[in-house]
C-alpha cells in the first residue's frame, strides 16, 4: 500500500470520531517528555483560511498548547495565504490570546530556493525557532548524485538559517522514502546532512511503509528535534487516534528522548486530533 501522505490521510480520515473534551489549564500539559501537546495546523487549513483566530481557540479548547504553522508563501494555495496579512506583533497577539505557542513552521523547498532570506525574515519576525521542509523534492528514482546534490543544497540552507538563530529541519515524505543504490534515501541523508545544521522531524505514519519511529530514534541519537504523531492500525492499515491501533507509544516517546525530540505535533483530521488528547495527557513514560 502506498504511503499515506499528509494530503492522502487527511482525505481518508474525515469520518466522525468523538470530539475532544475541553481541558482545564492544569491538564493541558502532556506527560510524555514533559512537553505541551502540540498539533500541526495542516489538517485545519480550511478552517484557518476562514477564521485563523477562531481556529486557534478551537485547538486550544481541545487541549493543544502549541501549534506548528505552514508558511503563507509555500502553502498559499492550501489555506495559509491569509497569514501574510498579519503584522508580526498582531500574529503573536492572536497566538497569545488563544493560549497557544508557536516556534515551528513548514516551508516549501521551492519557496526557500526562490527567496530563503524572505522566509527567514518572516520566521524570525514571529519568533520561530524551527523551519522545516516536508521533502527535499528530489526525483522518485534518484541517483546517488541526486541525493548528494539535494543534501549539499539543504546543508547550505541550514547554515543560512543557523546564522539567524533558527534550526533547519527535514520531514520525511516522498523523495526521502525512495531508494538509492539499494538503500533507503532517508538513511543515506543521515550521513550527508550536517547534524548541527539540519535536524529531522519524523512522520510516525510512515510506519505504513516500514519506517519505525522508535527504530530511527534509537539508531540516530540526537538527530531529531520533532515528530508528527498519528495513530496507526496494522489490522485496517488506517490512521486512528493516538492511543488506539497498534503502535507502542511508551516505546516511541521513550526512544524519542534518545532521538533528541523537543516537540511533537498531532496531525490528523480534527476529530481524531481532539480524540488523541486524553490519551496523551495520561501517557507516562520513563
Predicted stretch roles:
Residues 2-38, 45-65, 124, 180-199, ...:
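Histidine-acidic metal/acid-base catalytic patches
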Residues 13-15, 19-20, 73, 94-199, ...:
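Active-site acidic/histidine proton-transfer and metal-coordination neighborhood
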Residues 38-50, 104-113:
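Active-site mouth loops of central-metabolism enzymes
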Residues 39, 69, 105, 133, ...:
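Conserved beta-strand positions
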Residues 42, 72, 110, 136, ...:
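Flexible loop residues that form catalytic
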Residues 49-52, 81-84, 88, 140-147, ...:
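Flexible, glycine- and charge-enriched loops at secondary-structure boundaries
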Residues 68-90:
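Glycine-rich, proline-tolerant flexible connector loops at the mouths of alpha/beta enzymes
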Residues 74-79, 139-144, 234-239:
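A short acidic, helix-capping loop that chelates divalent metal ions and anchors anionic groups
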Amino acid at each position: 500500500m502506498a504511503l499515506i501522505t499528509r494530503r492522502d490521510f487527511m482525505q481518508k480520515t474525515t469520518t466522525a470520531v468523538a470530539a475532544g473534551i475541553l481541558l482545564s489549564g492544569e491538564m493541558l500539559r502532556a506527560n510524555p517528555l514533559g512537553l505541551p501537546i502540540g498539533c500541526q495546523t495542516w489538517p485545519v487549513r480550511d478552517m484557518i483560511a476562514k477564521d485563523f483566530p477562531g481556529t486557534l481557540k478551537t485547538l486550544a479548547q481541545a487541549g493543544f498548547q502549541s501549534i506548528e504553522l505552514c508558511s503563507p508563501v509555500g502553502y498559499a494555495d492550501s489555506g495559509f495565504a491569509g497569514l501574510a496579512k498579519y503584522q508580526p506583533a498582531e500574529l503573536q497577539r492572536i497566538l497569545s490570546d488563544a493560549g497557544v505557542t508557536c516556534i515551528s513552521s513548514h516551508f516549501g523547498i521551492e519557496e526557500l530556493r526562490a527567496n530563503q532570506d524572505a522566509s527567514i525574515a518572516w520566521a524570525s519576525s514571529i519568533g520561530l525557532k524551527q523551519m522545516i521542509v516536508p521533502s527535499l523534492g528530489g526525483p522518485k528514482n534518484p541517483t546517488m548524485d541526486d541525493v548528494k546534490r539535494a543534501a549539499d543544497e539543504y546543508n547550505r540552507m541550514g547554515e543560512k538559517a543557523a546564522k539567524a538563530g533558527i534550526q533547519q529541519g527535514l520531514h520525511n515524505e516522498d523523495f526521502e522514502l525512495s531508494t538509492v543504490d539499494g538503500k533507503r534515501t532517508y538513511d543515506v541523508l543521515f550521513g550527508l546532512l550536517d547534524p548541527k545544521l539540519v535536524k529531522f522531524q519524523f512522520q510516525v505514519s510512515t510506519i505504513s511503509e516500514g519506517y519505525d519511529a522508535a527504530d530511527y530514534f534509537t539508531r540516530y541519537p540526537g538527530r531529531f528535534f520533532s515528530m508528527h504523531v498519528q495513530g496507526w492500525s496494522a489490522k485496517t492499515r488506517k490512521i486512528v487516534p493516538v492511543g488506539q491501533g497498534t503502535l507502542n507509544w511508551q516505546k516511541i516517546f521513550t526512544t524519542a528522548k534518545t532521538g533528541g525530540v523537543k516537540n511533537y505535533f498531532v496531525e490528523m483530521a480534527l476529530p481524531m486530533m481532539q480524540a488523541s488528547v486524553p490519551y496523551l495527557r495520561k501517557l507516562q513514560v520513563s
